[in-house]
């Protein structure tokens, strides 16, 4: 597609074709008072060389993980991405936004999506998965709507240990649909089980949990699932896929629907996106899933083939009654996820998860030895942890920047009661020397 603006001759042809004499006549319905009178101040075009230098100067103003050592997490994670991921990802046959409606010319794309779905099912212990979602937050919101549809109930329980921005997206999706959201407090960095049990009744469609949660803590998912099921509700789990290299799968813990942010596999930080969400569920809920689903079948010659299946759920079939109203998906990001995870294999994933766990615990232990600093919550955590500090978190982060270290997230941004707390993330990308440098830098701050 050509993005060069129309020429004067082309404009005249368009106006003649639609029966309008001039541009002024075309825009006659727009009042003069709201029209821009002055010309836009747009500079002259740049040569390619000038443009590359200009964009390079702009990019140099950013602080990236190439130049700085970062301990930020909170939903976007720095992981090592092997070179084979981009080598395969950027092949021209994959590098397209085309939705594969015509299976006869889309077998490669369809098979790649099918493999993604298969990997998600293996990771989560679920029976079916879709082709991907926009991100982890929208996947969780769609899972909540699935739960309401499946149970015919209009209330969900949402712990405050779920990512605060995920909770914002939940409100955006659910409140206009008349779904009541009841937030459950936390205790020691995990869901307050007593408060949850009191809030549970036969009006609740689902209990939503995130494990590892926003604070990095492992929730008691199996116990929470049993409580939800006892009242006829569902258990929806948001998970970090890397953690599943060590932890029990959500399916083993009794989850009915599982979602998550897929960015940790194959997708760089990208200053916040694009990312991808995944959504998987038990077989009885598959027809309520949003998004595309690719299925395996056989052609008339008995050869294996792939097609978009269960399309009666989708908007191009059922319009406003559709279970799915997703206009696209994150297929290229999902392909990066698939390539990275396939390359790791079970053993590689387990090793990756083990490194994340060990390095985070080493970092937490060493920081906790510093005067005026301690681990805020006691309990099992994966690769994120909260540090309580007597020094201002902002002062700590500003001081660390002078060492080219990006420190933890100031939790007061989302939790006013945690104004002296920082959330740190340590992944396999950090060496012992990196962590020791962080600890030394924090130790200098008075």
Curated annotation (Swiss-Prot):
Gene3D superfamilies: Aspartate Aminotransferase, domain 1 (3.90.1150.10), Type I PLP-dependent aspartate aminotransferase-like (Major domain) (3.40.640.10). It catalyses: N(6)-[(R)-lipoyl]-L-lysyl-[glycine-cleavage complex H protein] + glycine + H(+) = N(6)-[(R)-S(8)-aminomethyldihydrolipoyl]-L-lysyl-[glycine-cleavage complex H protein] + CO2. It holds the Pfam family GDC-P. GO terms for molecular function: glycine dehydrogenase (decarboxylating) activity. The keyword Oxidoreductase applies. CDD domains: GDC-P. The keyword Disulfide bond does not apply. Its EC number is 1.4.4.2. GO terms for biological process: glycine decarboxylation via glycine cleavage system; nucleoside metabolic process. Keywords: Oxidoreductase. The glycine cleavage system is composed of four proteins: P, T, L and H. In this organism, the P 'protein' is a heterodimer of two subunits. HAMAP family: GcvPA. Belongs to the GcvP family. N-terminal subunit subfamily. This is Probable glycine dehydrogenase (decarboxylating) subunit 1. It comes from Desulfitobacterium hafniense (strain Y51). The lineage of its organism: Bacteria, Bacillati, Bacillota, Clostridia, Eubacteriales. The gene is gcvPA.
């Amino acid at each position: 597609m050509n993005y060069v603006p129309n020429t004067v001759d082309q404009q005249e042809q368009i106006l003649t074709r639609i029966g309008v004499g001039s541009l002024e006549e075309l825009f006659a319905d727009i009042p003069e008072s709201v029209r821009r009178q002055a010309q836009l101040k747009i500079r002259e075009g740049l040569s390619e060389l000038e443009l590359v230098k200009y964009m390079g100067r702009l990019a140099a103003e950013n602080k990236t993980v190439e130049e700085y050592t970062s301990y930020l997490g909170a939903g976007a994670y720095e992981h090592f991405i092997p070179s084979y991921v981009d080598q395969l990802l950027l092949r021209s046959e994959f590098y397209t936004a085309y939705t594969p409606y015509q299976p006869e010319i889309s077998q490669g794309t369809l098979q790649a999506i099918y493999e993604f779905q298969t990997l998600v099912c293996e990771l989560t212990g679920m029976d079916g998965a879709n082709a991907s979602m926009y991100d982890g937050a929208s996947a969780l919101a769609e899972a909540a709507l699935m739960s309401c549809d499946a149970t015919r109930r209009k209330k969900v329980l949402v712990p405050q240990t779920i990512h605060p921005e995920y909770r914002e997206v939940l409100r955006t999706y659910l409140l206009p649909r008349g779904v009541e959201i009841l937030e459950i407090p936390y205790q020691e960095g995990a869901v307050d089980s007593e408060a949850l049990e009191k809030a549970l009744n036969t009006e609740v469609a689902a209990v939503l949990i995130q494990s590892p949660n926003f604070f990095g803590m492992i929730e008691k998912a199996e116990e929470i699932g049993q409580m939800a099921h006892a009242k006829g509700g569902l258990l929806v789990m948001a998970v970090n896929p890397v953690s599943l290299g060590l932890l029990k799968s959500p399916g083993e813990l009794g989850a009915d629907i599982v979602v998550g942010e897929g960015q940790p596999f194959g997708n760089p930080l990208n200053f916040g996106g694009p990312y991808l969400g995944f959504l998987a569920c038990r077989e009885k809920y598959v027809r309520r899933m949003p998004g595309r689903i690719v299925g395996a079948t056989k052609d008339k010659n008995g050869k294996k083939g792939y097609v978009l299946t269960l399309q009666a759920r989708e908007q191009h079939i059922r319009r406003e009654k559709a279970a799915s109203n997703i206009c696209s998906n994150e297929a290229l990001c999902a392909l990066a996820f698939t390539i990275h995870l396939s390359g790791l294999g079970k053993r590689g994933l387990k090793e990756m998860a083990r490194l994340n766990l060990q390095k985070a615990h080493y970092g937490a232990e060493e920081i906790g030895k510093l005067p005026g600093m301690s681990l805020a919550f006691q309990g099992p955590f994966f690769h994120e942890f909260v540090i309580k500090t007597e020094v201002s978190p902002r002062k700590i982060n500003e001081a660390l920047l002078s060492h080219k270290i990006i420190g933890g997230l100031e939790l007061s941004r989302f939790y006013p009661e945690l104004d002296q707390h920082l959330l740190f993330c340590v992944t396999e990308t950090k060496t012992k020397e990196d962590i020791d440098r962080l600890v030394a830098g924090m130790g200098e701050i008075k």
